Amino acid sequence: MLDKHRICISSPPDREKLVAEIFFGDTQWAEINQERDTLEVEFYPRPDGRLWRIDYPVVLRVLEEAKRRLRGE
């Protein structure tokens, strides 16, 4: 399931700093931003209104990878 996730580092116009956008397929489900002193995660709803169901270890791996890329590690 990890290979269906995509992480994009971007510079949206509404942010001062870079963000890590996290997608499952073509649908964004989370974003990590660094606008404050600590990293902050925003979770987005599915377009169809259903709940996201993603295995816990996968979520952790994807978030850690996104954090690593965002920090340039």
Residue ranges and their predicted role:
Residues 16-48:
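A short, structured beta-strand/loop element
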Residues 4, 35-40, 64-69:
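Short, surface-exposed, charge-dense and proline/glycine-enriched linear segments
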Residues 1-17:
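Negatively charged, low-complexity tracts enriched in Asp/Glu with abundant Ser/Thr
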Residues 10, 32-35, 57:
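Surface-exposed loop/turn and secondary-structure junction residues enriched for glycine/proline
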